[in-house]
């Protein structure tokens, strides 16, 4: 028995208002292990000050990014339902730079090429819209390792950044 998983047939299309609840729900399930990893790295005291209710904050961040007129939002659809999404900011940080703002894949569909397809779609979208550079940011903790692997495979160059935290009280 092979451990390889067959890539999933998906369509990527602009996100519609009716997709938003499903996208928020899948994003929360997708990021649960990521936030758990961040909590393990930072410890409870710092994590809970930064993210007292990460689910509510993250749900609002996804809704806001998807509704933002300054962003382009797309959804990956398989079997008639959203299985992933991405929001893209054009001229982010610098003129001519496009950014993958938020990207997420339903855990039931991870490791089937959805994140890679959304990333490549995003890069192509930025190129078509006249961007010269694409950027994406992610964490350096173990929970973000799958995302880093996707961006490495997509040809992004890593710029290591260090962010330190210290509890003051």
For each feature predicted by the language model, list its residue ranges.
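Conserved acetyl-CoA-binding loop-helix of GNAT-fold acetyltransferases
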Residues: 105, 111-124, 149, 153
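Conserved GNAT acetyl-CoA-binding A-motif
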Residues: 126-139
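Short phosphate-binding/catalytic loops that engage adenosine nucleotides
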Residues: 114, 131, 156
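Flexible, active-site-proximal loop/turn residues at the rims of small-molecule/cofactor binding pockets
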Residues: 92, 109, 140
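Accessory recognition modules or surfaces
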Residues: 112, 135, 143-154, 169
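Acetyl-CoA-dependent GNAT
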Residues: 10, 14-101, 106, 119-120, ...
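Terminal substrate-recognition subdomain of acyl/acetyltransferases
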Residues: 2-6, 153-157, 161-169
